Amino acid sequence: MARLLTNRQADELHKSIIAYLSANDLPNTAAALRAELNLTEEDFDATAVKKYETLLEKKWTSIVRLQKKIMDLEARNAALQSELDNLTPASLLKPRRDPTSWLPTHPPRYSLESHRDTINCIAFHPKFSSLASGSDDFTIKIWDWELGELEMTLKGHTRAVLDVDYGSPQGITMLASCSSDLSVKLWDPAEGYKNVRTLLGHDHSVSAVRFIPCRNLLASASRDKDVRIWDVTTGYCVRSIQGHTGWVRDVCPSFDGNFLFSSGDDMTARLWDISAIPNPENKVTMAGHEHFIECCALAPPTSYQYLAPVAGLKGPSYPKSAAEFMATGSRDKTIKVWDVRGTCLMTLIGHDNWVRGIVFHPAGKYLLSVSDDRTLRCWDLSQEGKCVKTIKDAHDRFVTCLSWAPGVAKDVPAIPSNTAKGESSEIKETLKSPDVQIRCVIATGSVDRKLQIFAA
């Protein structure tokens, strides 16, 4: 039989056994073992016996204590593993799906409640699992969408919060909000969402706010018919853009920060070139809706391959600018998809009430929309805008807003803001789609005061 103990360990064990037997009035057994092991009185005298007589008992009780500790640690480990499994994002526990074709399914992962009035707007943190929502109850709430928990409530606005947006001017993530109280507020997540700045200048309700990528700027749209551009650092309005003849309800910047797309109650959508802030240019005005335009969105470069053939364009599979295609949603119950020339490429018909929010799928193939008809619809741009999925009763009442969690983008080559007109098209052709990892998570808000989280 193979030995587990070294010679020294075996010798220590033998002496401990002999000492234990001697101390417990078993001299004959001890003597027999001593004889078997050839231990003489000189090798193992009375003094040595005294040294070893309690050693066996100490080791035995130590083993019992260690065994109990092992059992306790195993139980604790099992509890922690169970807790970890519950905290692990479901998207990591399930088999990986192709994010480029993922669409939301019913029921939602979470239905979050805490607001006391209509939820008007939602925005995802660009990196973390935080989600901001703004409401008619004057508050902004910060949620953890992975855990389905409310983290905090921000108070500061004195009227309804109409829009929120996360951005990273100068590499520092901030939250912007706007309200019927005529103000735009900036909040710092790194300081517990402290209100670090309030921007004043609009003469009526501020309906939309967006950080302008790649620049230290913020855009806001208002019922006063203006679009304003703000310097985030100073809080000063650096430009007021006028052109709309009615309430400007929504504004959307291009991913390179050189264009703004706006829409409103004058039933038009306008594309602005803001590459030169002092002299913004209205590149094109799009008209065709028969009612107020509630929302607008610029198509990501990934949509170009699906929309270019419809527009009759041929060439490389990426746009020459960051504002080649766009979409608008209206109270006339339709969604229209446009090209940069102002041509309506598609009219998507299917909603039975006002269209309140639209968002392009990050992979570019789909357009998602929500409406006062309580549905969430998915339109396939590769099939000329066919509605391929409808989530009925996404909410109990009107669905007011929709947002897709942004992927984490790598550096993207952008058109320099000082590019002169007529300059070589080689610069523009360097503009390609951002390299992002798609997060399959969307959120919707409603008059029913609920925030629905749909996730893979």
Swiss-Prot record:
Pfam families: LisH_PAC1, WD40
Record GO terms (molecular function): dynein complex binding
Keywords: Cell cycle, Cell division, Coiled coil, Cytoplasm, Cytoskeleton, Microtubule, Mitosis, Repeat, Transport, WD repeat
Subcellular location: Cytoplasm, Cytoskeleton; Cytoplasm, Cytoskeleton, Spindle pole
GO biological process: cell division; establishment of mitotic spindle orientation; microtubule sliding
CDD domains attached to this UniProt entry: WD40
Residue ranges of coiled coil: 61-88
SMART domains the UniProt entry points to: WD40 (SM00320)
ATP-binding keyword on record: no
Chief location bin: cytoplasm
Residue ranges of every copy of the LisH domain listed in the record: 9-41
Segments annotated as WD repeats: 114-153, 156-197, 201-240, 243-282, 288-348, 350-389, 394-437, 439-456
Keyword Metal-binding part of the UniProt annotation: no
Written domain comment of the UniProt record: Dimerization mediated by the LisH domain may be required to activate dynein.
Assigned protein family: Belongs to the WD repeat LIS1/nudF family.
Protein name: Nuclear distribution protein PAC1
